[in-house]
Amino acid sequence: MLFSSLVFLFTFLPITLLVYYLVPRKVKNVVLLIASLIFYAWGEPVYIFLMLISILFNYFCGMDIALKAGRKSQVRSLIFTIVVNLFILGFFKYYGFIVTNLNAILPFYIPYRKLELPIGISFYTFQTLSYIIDVYRGNVDVQVNLIDFGTYVTMFPQLIAGPIVQYADVERQLRERKESLTKFGYGAWFFVMGLAKKVLLANTIGSIYENIAAMDGMSVVTAWLGCLAYTFQIYFDFSGYSDMAVGLGKMFGFEFMQNFNYPYISKSVTEFWRRWHISLGSWFREYVYIPLGGNRVTVPRHLLNLLIVWFLTGLWHGASWNFVVWGLFYGVILITEKYFTGKILAKLPEAVQILYTMILVMLGWVLFFSPTLGSAFTWIGNMFGQGATGFMDSQALYLIMRNWLFWVAGIIGSTPFMHLLGKRLVFDEERPHTVLAGCLMTGLFVLCVAYLVTESYNPFLYFRF
């Protein structure tokens, strides 16, 4: 079930909100847990059992780790819990990838059956790992209430696409959060803005990318336009979904971290990754990079730490060599900026810094969206004239002229301009102009629903992760 589906907007969400606000405080988490399990089972009825097993396993392992505090056996319990969680994730996500590569080099064939990836498994596995590790470190108290722990793991606003919520950030909110009309209003605003980004921008621009990707040949300009279309699509798709998650969290009294901070205005690739998928970067920093020693080590070890983190970041996104190369691509760039080009880059005009960043990010997206490394290099070759049908052709001109409004909307929407304009029009000293906000939200919501009713193209790119 997608947030941008009609069944969610007009059936699931209204019923869940109604029941949630009617029941007493002590059973609100029960309502959230049941609703979240229904939400997940709607699209993955079989894998609901895997999620329930994960909840029970990590609940009891957390209790075990807490009881063994200060003893050597606590470390063994921690390692066991982490290994089991990673094994489950690896089995469903990387089993086929590993066997396929082994079959390519071994003299015999290993038969295997392709497994469907449980939706959201990468996200909720990282959440349970953050809980387990923080219990071991003593950063949080062990959760003894199974309902509260289950609510944390399954909470539908961020279950299938994040943001990745670390347990420490919601530990108190699970029991002591407070709902209010003001918070609900802010949540509705975030949700509708995210829905508009997803439906009106990501879906529309995404169809442009799909049309270009289906071409047999393309000019240099067409190849860049296709890459630009995907660049806009993945940002509005994922950040829109994250905004909806943050908004839904507010409606139920929670405060989740913002997952995006206008990454396409970054002046370096290092800055880009401070602004893109912030919760994932925060997770890897807290639970991988810092335990490896961070930057408080020798230069060779620091380089290795960065490459390990970015190798794992690429692998987290998918089981293919494309994602591995994509992750290492960023690892090498960040190392280069850290030790060689960072100071030089900082002296360049701001526009040049942003252009430099966007070119590298767009090249990275080619690795990301291409089905194979070969097709990625072919597309990149087209972008620089190798194998292209020419520099500019009638198809490229048509794509520019026919879709000029979406190109402009993509550029403007990637900057804080609309946010600042909305804040100025709708908010005054953090208090919303209720009538104007209501009119804007209603108008955007109606446009989104009209699109969903008439169009069938409504993918969500991060479902595969």
Spans of features found by a protein language model:
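Membrane-embedded transmembrane alpha-helical bundles that form the catalytic cores
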Residues: M1-R464
